[in-house]
Amino acid sequence: MAVVKMRDVAAHAGVSVSTVSKILSGSAASSQIPMHTIERVRLSASQLGYIPNAVARSLRTQRTREIGVVLGMETYPEPAALTLDGAFLLGLINAAAICHLPGVVVYPREENSVIADVSRYLDGRIDGLLVRSSTPHQEEQLLRLLANSPLPVVAIWTQDVPATVGYVDVDHFAGASQAIQYLLELGHRRIAYVEPAPMFEHPHFLARYQGYQQALIDEQIQPRPEWHVVGIEREKMRALLRLPEPITAIFTPNDIAAGEVATILQSMHLHIPADVSLVGFDDIVNAHLIAGGLTTVHQPIQQISVQAMRNLTALIAGAPVAESRTVLATSLAIRNSCAPPPVQ
């Protein structure tokens, strides 16, 4: 396969070589270039598979030993951006130290510019890239483009990756199932699943819902349609509690949703867990402050971060991709938001 040169990108984009150089180098002069031209050049570079010379030199000679990180902090509404992604970032910084790496290079994500951004990961500054999945469509596109580059890549929080990409994820299905099994052991038989939006547009939340369903079915309990609530609203919570057979526990697919549910229940003068038990998922940094101490499925963020760093360094060293794919177990953090169901 012929090496794509800067002049090829220029011809494809219909601009001069100097314009391509300014745009792809990120020089200050490119600020005078119209945005539509910048986007066209970056798109051409990605489509042609252009790789800056610095990358080839780095791969042939020495490595920087620096790891790039792409997080989804811009795509998560607060306060989730300050909890889950913040925890991942701290975990990855600690993981770099554990793996004796000098540090991480964090790449801010620009909205709607996944294709345009690919070239910045290929400038030779980093030896490999970690991509934390938060918005599947964007990450799928980014991973697909990077899969054809020489840059080793490991995805965090997804298993839907190209053949050349490693990953680290947790077992979302088993985690949700464990949470429901705990409620069943306490005596609950009418357990609602309350989510802010339909499956959050992410496969993980579908897996959590399926884990919820299967745990009930395994106990010969058929999940009822009215137990599945989309949208955390006062009237919807009231409807759950006014069913002919009211629910006695609520499971949410993340802790932010659990906090919103807790706020509504408390505004209705209901007590957690005396009136309703509540379980979340993630075990975010403030989970112990939700509902007097939220029982939740714990994602081992530090372990995920270390494993991701190890998987990536293994890929950089030439290990097979299959050896850089890991699914970790979750655990249940039991606190104060669950109790046996109230006597009817």
Name each region found by the language model.
Residues A96-P108, Y193, Y209, Q213-R234:
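Short beta-strand elements in bilobed, periplasmic/extracellular small-molecule ligand-binding domains
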Residues V168-V194, G231-A239, V297-A317:
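Hydrophobic alpha-helical segments within soluble ligand-binding/sensing domains
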Residues S177-I221, S324-C338:
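An alpha-beta-alpha
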Residues M1, K5, Q62-Q181, L240-P246, ...:
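Alpha-helical recognition/docking segments in bacterial nutrient-uptake
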Residues M1-R65:
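N-terminal helix-turn-helix DNA-binding module of bacterial transcription factors
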Residues R238-Q344:
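Flexible loop/turn connectors
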Residues R189-R190, P223-E226, H271-S277:
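Short acidic capping loops at alpha-helix termini that bridge into adjacent secondary structure
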